[in-house]
């Protein structure tokens, strides 16, 4: 016969809890334990009523879990065991309910999305298809397909046309080069509040570069929807799935091009606007068609990757131009101040090869099936050699940044480990011909290499920490006067030399 159900399990189980072990003498160890009467705790009435926990049953879950571990030593062990077994289903139910209650709503949604993605992948595998890659364009295209509102569907499709991740990379390279431009002494904290260039120019540079990149990417998708449909990496693009019409895509590309070049022309300078327009033309008009003609298309695409650093450099140089501010002065300055921009462009040009060679290797058969000529399948041995060759270029390029006065010489030391890492992965990629995980290793090394080099260059920018020190602690007036006199003397000597050369030319 089972005992009657306990109305207040919390109080009863707490009284049944075994006493804690204490260090005691051998004599005290043999003394019988004292029996504590089942009376309410006196001290608890100072704060709240003894029956408050029992009425609210807030501790029943915790106490019942402890009850499963209690082993009674009294004569009524069987009775306690039966009562524990009778309460265990309730405890298990409470435990599962409590766990479900503890899961945050966003965690539940993430779990549901993972289950849905796994189900879709299993269904695609059952049909003999490969699951779609979870890149930004695929996710945006899937989001656009699920929208019921035509406006939201078109906005998501247009965002997918812009290739957000690639556009973000292009914009960041332009912004980093803009920030790396050496700030002249006339923009030092002695005359301005912060040792930086115009933030408004940076804003227009960011907006213009974003729209120019979006225009080029949209035109790229417009040109090759048939080849995109043959590749797992690109078959989920909006034009392949007919999520947006070609007319709307053309309109988006044209408007983005006009907005981007216009923002660069009126907000920055005409030279940067021309570079943005050249980026669109080379990427959409040369690189995209040549992908089906020759493997040399990779070099054309690398030129496109080197243009954004030139845009950032020309944008910064236009603010300190002393002459007419033409493209010759900004890109081919007679004093050699434009060398840093070309070195940064060369760095981005060289980075394209180890990155793309590693990226194209796992999907070389898909490129071949789509009719796109890439070195990964046309000449696999040369594919590894090209990646290795251009990975060695980064060491002299980093040294050139130091020699050009863009960064301190300490940058050559701090950038060496990350350059050595890229070289090591390129050697493995060339030696194993993309096998044994070498392609994946080189890909991730290239992914982390570019932001690492950029961040190190910004940290070692020439004179940056000196200007920060002066802006915080100030500088001596005599020191500033000496620097100003030295600068005036150097300018006077340069003007005198140029005047003498002009007179010799006239004679």
Curated annotation (Swiss-Prot):
It is found in: Mitochondrion membrane. The keyword Mitochondrion applies. InterPro entries: Protohaem_IX_farnesylTrfase (IPR006369), Protohaem_IX_farnesylTrfase_mt (IPR016315), UbiA_prenyltransferase (IPR000537), UbiA_prenylTrfase_CS (IPR030470), UbiA_sf (IPR044878). It comes from Gibberella zeae (strain ATCC MYA-4620 / CBS 123657 / FGSC 9075 / NRRL 31084 / PH-1). Converts protoheme IX and farnesyl diphosphate to heme O. It catalyses: heme b + (2E,6E)-farnesyl diphosphate + H2O = Fe(II)-heme o + diphosphate. Keywords: Heme biosynthesis, Membrane, Mitochondrion, Transferase, Transit peptide, Transmembrane, Transmembrane helix. This is Protoheme IX farnesyltransferase, mitochondrial. The gene is COX10. It is a multi-pass membrane protein. Belongs to the UbiA prenyltransferase family. One of its GO terms (cellular component) is mitochondrial membrane. The chain crosses the membrane at residues 166-186, 199-219, 248-268, 270-290, 298-318, 339-359, 392-412, 441-461. HAMAP family: CyoE_CtaB. One of its GO terms (molecular function) is protoheme IX farnesyltransferase activity. It comes from the Eukaryota. Its main location: mitochondrion.
């Amino acid at each position: 016969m089972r005992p009657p159900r306990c109305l207040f399990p919390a109080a009863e189980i707490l009284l049944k809890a075994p006493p804690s072990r204490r260090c005691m003498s051998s004599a005290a160890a043999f003394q019988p334990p004292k029996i504590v009467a089942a009376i309410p705790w006196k001290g608890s009435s100072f704060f709240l009523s003894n029956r408050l926990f029992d009425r609210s049953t807030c501790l029943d879950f915790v106490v019942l879990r402890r009850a499963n571990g209690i082993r009674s030593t009294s004569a009524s062990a069987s009775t306690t065991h039966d009562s524990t077994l009778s309460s265990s289903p309730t405890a298990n139910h409470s435990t599962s309910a409590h766990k479900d209650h503890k899961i945050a709503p966003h965690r539940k949604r993430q779990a549901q999305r993972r289950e849905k993605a796994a189900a879709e992948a299993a269904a695609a595998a059952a049909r003999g298809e490969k699951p779609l890659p979870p890149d930004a364009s695929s996710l945006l295209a899937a989001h656009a397909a699920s929208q019921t509102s035509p406006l939201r569907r078109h906005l998501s499709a247009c965002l997918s046309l812009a290739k957000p991740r690639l556009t973000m990379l292009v914009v960041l390279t332009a912004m980093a080069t803009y920030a790396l431009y050496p700030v002249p002494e006339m923009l030092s904290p002695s005359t301005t509040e912060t040792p930086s260039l115009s933030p408004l120019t940076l804003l227009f540079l960011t907006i213009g570069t974003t729209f120019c990149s979006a225009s080029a990417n949209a035109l790229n998708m417009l040109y090759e929807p048939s080849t995109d449909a043959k590749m797992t990496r690109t078959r989920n693009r909006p034009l392949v799935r007919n999520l947006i019409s070609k007319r709307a895509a053309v309109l988006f590309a044209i408007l983005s091009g006009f907005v981007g070049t216009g923002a660069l022309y009126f907000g920055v300078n005409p030279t940067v606007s021309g570079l943005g327009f050249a980026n669109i033309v080379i990427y959409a008009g040369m690189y995209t068609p040549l992908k089906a003609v020759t493997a040399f298309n990779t070099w054309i695409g690398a030129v496109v990757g080197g243009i954004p650093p030139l845009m950032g450099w020309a944008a910064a140089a236009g603010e300190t131009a002393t002459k007419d501010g033409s493209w010759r002065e900004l890109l081919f300055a007679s004093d050699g101040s434009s060398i840093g921009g070309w070195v940064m462009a060369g760095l981005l040009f060289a980075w394209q090869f180890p990155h793309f060679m590693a990226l194209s290797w796992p999907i070389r058969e898909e490129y071949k099936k789509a009719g796109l000529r890439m070195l990964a399948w046309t000449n696999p041995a040369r594919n590894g050699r090209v990646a290795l060759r251009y990975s060695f270029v980064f060491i002299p390029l980093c040294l050139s940044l130091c020699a050009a006065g863009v960064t301190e010489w300490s940058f050559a030391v701090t950038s060496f480990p990350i350059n050595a890492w890229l070289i090591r992965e390129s050697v493995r990629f060339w030696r194993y011909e993309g096998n044994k995980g070498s392609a994946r290793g080189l890909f991730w090394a290239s992914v982390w290499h570019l932001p690492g080099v950029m961040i190190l260059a910004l940290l070692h920018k020439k004179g940056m920490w000196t200007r920060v020190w002066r802006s915080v602690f100030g500088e001596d007036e005599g020191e500033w006067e000496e620097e100003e006199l030295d600068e005036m003397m150097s300018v006077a000597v340069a003007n005198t030399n140029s005047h003498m050369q002009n007179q010799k030319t006239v004679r």
